[in-house]
């Protein structure tokens, strides 16, 4: 086990150190464990690796990426932003509305894509009013990060949780007779919106915005809504007993997302009488993230086969004792702190089996249901990224946009918004989760 743990720590550090090559580092780690399996050090074969890969998650990710690209190209997000801003009285309300819009979109769309959609509107408003766009774009970024945990398709970490725990789209709203994580995220969002409103309390300059953007195609919006609807419907399908139907059942969410994406791209090709839209849609996919997830599935299965996951679960159980509240607080606090500085995708992927193992050790070894701890892990890992400028990809994207537009973003500018926003969201979100699931 020492060899496996050393290898995992080495490859994890390399993923943090060379961010631009992290998919290849993860793939190298997966290859290393497969080699050890081939040499007989661990019981880990190529067939085991293939079974470890959650192709449903990968298909969901790829399909949503493609549909979101078509949605952005239709200019519907910009139109929505202009329509909303045209009805607000001042800057304070404009920033709050943009943050709300970014959060709403991010519940169904990748966080970085959300920032790319909404940021141009924030920039335009700030320029018209001759104000710094820095706090506006920071507010948009942290709001998009928060809402990513609200639904199954809102963020990569949510999709990872859904795949690992066998959760469907509806489970994020209501699960086992209790409110799902969606409601805790929304309560946290209300608290953090109050923080934003307070931070911008002096920004009372009137806003005058005209609706200028023309939506080029309504179908991508319909496809996005249809994707959500079909994912909900797929949640209620009965599970077949076996064979090809069972295989299709295990891939149902991925097939829905990928099928609608391909339909949208094919329709765009038909409208333009060329294959260019299809090529652009496939170019828009985030292949680095897809390869990273593919590799992590194999790497973490190898780590698990070596006994590292069980040892980590024992360590967490020893630290928290047999008290669920202690474990919950430890998970949330550790996730918030670590995700402020490291990427939450490999962190969540690594911690999900650990959390499952700790839950099995609770209650004197009889085990308890892990849902509370899964939701706590996701909440902490998602919100922790808002503490620092480098804690989440959406933050980095927003800062990149600002720098391209000649703006200087100081760390204290980000912390002034990110820290109180995160504290409010974590306290209310994690607190409500405990009320729903822990008592």
What are these model-predicted stretches?
Residues 1-72, 79, 175-314, 407-409, ...:
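Hydrophobic transmembrane alpha-helices of multi-pass small-molecule transporters
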Residues 47-134, 289-364:
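Membrane-embedded alpha-helical segments and adjacent helix-loop junctions characteristic
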Residues 80, 113-124, 137-138, 151-167, ...:
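Re-entrant/interfacial helical elements at transmembrane boundaries that shape
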Residues 91-104, 130-147, 172, 177, ...:
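Alpha-helical transmembrane segments of multi-pass membrane proteins
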Residues 124-134, 166, 170-180, 200-209, ...:
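Alpha-helical transmembrane bundle and helix-membrane interface signal
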Residues 148-149, 182-190, 337-344, 382-390, ...:
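Hydrophobic transmembrane alpha-helical segments of multi-pass transport and channel proteins
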Residues 167-171, 357-372, 435-439:
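Helix-coil boundary and interhelical linker segments in multi-pass alpha-helical membrane proteins
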């Amino acid at each position: 086990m020492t060899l496996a743990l050393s290898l995992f720590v080495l490859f994890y550090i390399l993923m943090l150190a060379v961010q631009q090559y992290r998919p290849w580092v993860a793939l190298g780690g997966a290859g290393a464990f497969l080699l050890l399996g081939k040499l007989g050090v661990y019981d880990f074969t190529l067939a085991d690796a293939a079974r470890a890969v959650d192709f449903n998650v990968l298909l969901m990710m790829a399909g949503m990426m493609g549909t979101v690209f078509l949605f952005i190209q239709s200019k519907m997000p910009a139109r929505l932003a202009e329509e909303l801003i045209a009805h607000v009285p001042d800057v304070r309300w404009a920033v709050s509305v943009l943050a709300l819009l970014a959060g709403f979109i991010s519940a169904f769309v990748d966080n970085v894509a959300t920032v790319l959609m909404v940021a141009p509107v924030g920039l335009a408003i700030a320029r018209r009013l001759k104000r710094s766009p820095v706090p506006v774009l920071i507010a948009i970024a942290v709001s998009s990060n928060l809402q990513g945990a609200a639904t199954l398709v809102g963020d990569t970490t949510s999709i990872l949780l859904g795949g690992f725990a066998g959760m469907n789209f509806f489970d994020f709203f209501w699960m086992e007779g209790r409110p799902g994580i969606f409601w805790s995220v929304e309560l946290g969002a209300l608290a953090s919106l109050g923080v934003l409103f307070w931070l911008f309390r002096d920004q009372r300059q009137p806003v005058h915005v005209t609706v200028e953007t023309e939506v080029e195609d309504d179908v991508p919006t319909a496809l996005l809504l249809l994707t959500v609807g079909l994912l909900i419907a797929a949640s209620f399908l009965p599970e077949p007993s076996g064979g090809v139907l069972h295989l299709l059942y295990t891939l149902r969410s991925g097939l829905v997302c990928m099928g609608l994406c391909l339909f949208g791209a094919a329709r765009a090709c038909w409208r333009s009488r060329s294959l260019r839209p299809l090529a652009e849609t496939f170019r828009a996919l985030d292949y680095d993230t897809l390869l990273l997830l593919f590799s992590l599935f194999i790497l973490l299965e190898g780590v698990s086969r070596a006994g590292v996951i069980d040892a980590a679960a024992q360590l967490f159980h020893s630290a928290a004792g047999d008290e669920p509240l202690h474990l919950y607080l430890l998970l949330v606090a550790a996730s918030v702190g670590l995700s402020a500085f490291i990427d939450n995708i490999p962190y969540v992927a690594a911690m999900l089996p650990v959390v499952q193992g700790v839950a099995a050790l609770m209650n004197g070894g009889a085990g308890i249901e892990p849902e509370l701890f899964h939701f706590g892990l996701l909440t902490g890992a998602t919100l922790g990224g808002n503490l620092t400028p480098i804690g989440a990809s959406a933050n980095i994207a927003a800062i990149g946009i600002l720098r391209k537009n000649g703006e200087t973003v100081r760390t204290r500018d980000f912390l002034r918004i990110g820290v109180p926003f995160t504290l409010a969201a974590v306290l209310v979100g994690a607190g409500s989760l405990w009320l729903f699931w822990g008592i």
